[in-house]
């Protein structure tokens, strides 16, 4: 019997319906040279032969040392984490709507919420969002719903916000009447000049978005921007790397009254790099805004016998209860990734997280300092950073990155795609996984490549 599920008549009907002339046309976005017509495997080989062949081919892969960052980070993941996550109780668990049958999963989410609220200094956390960009978009929608005093649906955003986050934000809010104004960054320090905010003082904003560390790795003037936003009646949305909060003050301490909503990408905490996902976004907020928070929230309660238990709470916010009035059409969470993050934070504890963050900063500082000793290479901005820093090169950065790949090093993130004035700049990121020997190899490879391409 055939294991192909669709008959030719069904395929033709499908193509006619969507207006495609052939199945190949469905995949014409994929360049021809990337498509494989055959797998180059002999017919009739047995499983042992096939396994040996795949091993030989896999050995042709090589793993560069990664210094890219820019929103997804290489951190050490203790072996115990994914060994636990892969257990059937977590790996195959379904939505925990039936609380009496889902106490283990619900408790994990509750512990995650508790730790994220503690890390960010906020009162409440949801069970996670799809990713950092989605979490920001939902935070903006949440802020507009919450800020009843705002006379507009305008949001003020610093130019140093991650460009991918901005694109997702614009896509999700495109047809919702929300407008964005952008504050240009200071070319000398790579962050928002607080004095420039006065140019926007006559506009009413529902929210102000502050990313710190920002896309260029710099620490924003969070106190000044937060106070300015609150003075002008806007809620403050903090976008941050959760790992940085182990050594930096929490968003709850920004300015006189702290941020109102905190969000970001949770991938650094126990989730491996995987071509863009699956990752998870986190969102926390002050209690005043919790009823406008999207996604799931797990609460702690007691049963009829007085025993402690956990359940999904405040569900009237969600679209499976009140679709027309829901806070979001997100009615899920990244449960498996959250489980990994919960175990990661539990295993490392506060001291472990602080150690990881400190070593990451120190390694980035060392790498940047050593690079700046090379003729023609310099640190771009004169302000504080966490674990990413922009480096100016005497050659085209994209060419430099390509040549460094030949030295088995992913040298950094090419910034010219988003900032034309940074065509000769890369952003480098180091974490606790990079050794002093790795950094020495990077420096020597840089000298070698610059000599080769004329730097």
From Swiss-Prot:
Catalytic reactions on record: N(6)-[(R)-lipoyl]-L-lysyl-[glycine-cleavage complex H protein] + glycine + H(+) = N(6)-[(R)-S(8)-aminomethyldihydrolipoyl]-L-lysyl-[glycine-cleavage complex H protein] + CO2
GO biological process, one term: glycine decarboxylation via glycine cleavage system
Pfam family membership, one: GDC-P
Keyword RNA-binding carried by entry: no
Its EC number(s): 1.4.4.2
Alphabetically ordered keywords of this record: Oxidoreductase
Organism superkingdom: Bacteria
Gene3D superfamilies, per the entry: Aspartate Aminotransferase, domain 1 (3.90.1150.10), Type I PLP-dependent aspartate aminotransferase-like (Major domain) (3.40.640.10)
Catalytic EC class: oxidoreductase
GO molecular function: glycine dehydrogenase (decarboxylating) activity
Subunit structure of this chain's protein: The glycine cleavage system is composed of four proteins: P, T, L and H. In this organism, the P 'protein' is a heterodimer of two subunits.
Family the UniProt entry places it in: Belongs to the GcvP family. N-terminal subunit subfamily.
Main function: The glycine cleavage system catalyzes the degradation of glycine. The P protein binds the alpha-amino group of glycine through its pyridoxal phosphate cofactor; CO(2) is released and the remaining methylamine moiety is then transferred to the lipoamide cofactor of the H protein.
Descriptive protein name: Probable glycine dehydrogenase (decarboxylating) subunit 1
Name of the gene this protein is made from: gcvPA
